[in-house]
From Swiss-Prot:
Function: Removal of H(2)O(2), oxidation of toxic reductants, biosynthesis and degradation of lignin, suberization, auxin catabolism, response to environmental stresses such as wounding, pathogen attack and oxidative stress. These functions might be dependent on each isozyme/isoform in each plant tissue.
Similarity comment: Belongs to the peroxidase family. Classical plant (class III) peroxidase subfamily.
Protein name: Peroxidase 52
Record's signal peptide: 1-20
Catalytic activity: 2 a phenolic donor + H2O2 = 2 a phenolic radical donor + 2 H2O
Keyword Calcium: yes
Needed cofactors: heme b; Ca(2+)
Glycan attachment sites: N213
Species name: Arabidopsis thaliana
Length: 324
């Protein structure tokens, strides 16, 4: 009887692993040397292309990093954000968080084209995006890390999931914590990954309410932002402002220093330092850039592990914007 009970328990455990949240199982299938034999020049090919793109326009580094973030938060890091709309499904590119703001697709397409010439049918678009995100950070002076690869590409995308899963710029602290927790990321991961706003820009429509209505904002900073972001909705909606007012083209810890002086551009930025549970993390990153870099790279690796397609799941797209 005892033997039968033990067998039953083992069967239950295996079943739960196979049917339940199997991120740990999938994680083990991603490795840093997945393409070392099948596409040995992959990393140098991606790095060269990203460097060229960022040298031409520093903002592109932030755009590629954002693409990766928005990809991973919608059904995992599967390259679904790269898919164009088709007659059979509406993709993620025109979801509210991405419409008129997601960019960098041409850079990923160019990299994919170069990789296909060298290693046809081998490297996924999902992996190219993951590597390009890392190289974008490095190109702007940020930390380096080893990217785990071995992902495959999704055959579909979900606008509904993009609308519901990607945190809004108006998110409260509790909403941010909840959104990140839903994909297995901790509060500390969330604050570290928010530090990606040390680079890039945002549209007036995303911060208008903050600069006109909120009180936890530096007055001079608000006045400066108001000059290019009119109060009336529909006027200047697409006008851009740097997320990091001090060093927008350098990956550093000034984003956190700005929060401590109430110069966070987005509502979802400033809530990280507003008398809440994350104040101490922001203060720590502001004082210790090495701590931020270390936590950021760890969080990026962890985010890259969100529900990847591996093995025989998905496909290796020939062109990133469409399925095979």
């Amino acid at each position: 009887m005892a033997s039968n009970k033990l067998i039953s328990i083992l069967v239950l455990v295996v079943t739960l692993l196979l049917q339940g949240d199997n991120n740990y199982v999938v994680e083990a299938q991603l490795t840093t040397n997945f393409y070392s034999t099948s596409c040995p020049n992959l990393l140098s090919t991606v790095q060269t292309a990203v460097k060229s793109a960022v040298n031409s326009e520093a903002r592109m580094g932030a755009s590629i990093l954002r693409l990766f973030f928005h990809d991973c938060f919608v059904n995992g890091c599967d390259g679904s954000i790269l898919l164009d709309d088709t007659s059979s499904f509406t993709g993620e590119q025109n979801a509210a968080p991405n419409r008129n703001s997601a960019r960098g697709f041409n850079v990923i397409d160019n990299i994919k084209s170069a990789v296909e010439k060298a290693c046809p049918g081998v490297v996924s678009c999902a992996d190219i995006l993951a590597i390009a995100a890392r190289d974008s950070v490095v190109a702007l002076g940020g930390p380096n890390w080893n990217v785990k690869v071995g992902r495959r590409d999704a055959r579909t995308a979900s606008q509904a999931a993009a609308n519901s899963n990607i945190p809004a710029p108006t998110s409260s602290l509790s909403q941010l914590i909840s959104s990140f927790s839903a994909v297995g990321l901790s509060t500390r991961d969330m604050v570290a990954l928010s530090g990606a706003h040390t680079i890039g820009q945002s549209r007036c429509t995303n911060f208008r309410a903050r600069i006109y209505n909120e009180t936890n904002i530096n007055a001079a900073f608000a006045t400066t932002r108001q000059r290019t972001c009119p109060r009336a909705s529909g006027s200047g909606d697409g006008n851009l402002a740097p997320l990091d007012v001090t060093t927008a083209a350098s990956f550093d810890n000034n984003y956190f220093k700005n929060l401590m002086t109430q110069r966070g551009l987005l509502h979802s930025d400033q809530v990280l330092f507003n008398g809440g549970s994350t104040d101490s993390i922001v203060r720590g990153y502001s004082n210790n850039p090495s701590s931020f870099n270390s936590d950021f790279t760890a969080a990026m690796i962890k985010m890259g592990d969100i529900s990847p397609l591996t093995g025989s799941s998905g496909e290796i797209r020939k062109v990133c914007g469409r399925t095979n």
